[in-house]
A protein has these predicted regions:
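Active-site region of PLP-dependent enzymes
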Residues: 22-27, 40-47, 54-169
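Glycine/serine-rich loop-strand microenvironments at binding/catalytic pocket rims
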Residues: 1, 53-54
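Catalytic PLP-binding core of fold-type I/II PLP enzymes
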Residues: 1-48, 80
Length: 169
């Protein structure tokens, strides 16, 4: 069951005078940034909007038990309607996920591109090629997977109707 993002944004806007930005991204919003934990929410909608569209940022998990899997890993999306500089955000995520390096492995294979900088103490959390291949295969069959999950939910709902259990919408 998703959060009431309308209410969350009402509270964030009402209290934004208490907010003090610590970096350029925060200053752009001039309020608390709302992040949706969308780990299990790939393909879901809220009021006809993708779950990725209701918050400033949305994080997804691609763990083996999630709706779309790469065995491990995940992704972060952001809502472009806020006038964000997509390239700057992408570059920041790339650097943080590649040990702080300014070039990924593919970029370093090009002639004369072996040189790179380490700008920050980053992390190793970029997706391996084999995991990406699994994810692409899952994505091709995702609509069928999602439809099958909906069928199972409908069967469970129907089976529980005779019990003293209230099924949430």
């Amino acid at each position: 069951v998703p959060c009431d993002y309308t209410r969350i944004f009402e509270v964030v806007e009402k209290k934004k005078d208490l907010f003090s930005a610590n970096n350029a991204l925060q200053a752009h919003f001039n309020r608390i940034i709302v992040v949706s934990d969308s780990a299990h929410a790939m393909g879901t909608t809220i009021n006809c909007l993708s779950v990725a569209q209701v918050a400033d940022f949305a994080s997804y998990s691609f763990h083996a038990v999630k709706n779309l899997t790469t065995a491990e890993g995940g992704c972060i999306t952001w809502n472009p309607k806020n006038g964000l500089n997509d390239e700057e955000i992408y570059r920041a995520f790339q650097i943080y996920s590649l040990h702080g390096q300014t070039k990924d492995a593919l970029a370093k294979t090009k002639p004369g591109s072996w040189e790179y900088d380490i700008e920050i103490p980053g992390y190793k959390c970029n997706m391996a090629d084999i995991m990406a291949a699994i994810g692409l295969a899952q994505l091709e069959r995702y609509e069928g997977i999602l439809n099958r999950r909906k069928e199972i939910v409908n069967q469970l709902d129907a089976g529980l109707k005779s019990e003293l259990i209230q099924v949430l919408p």
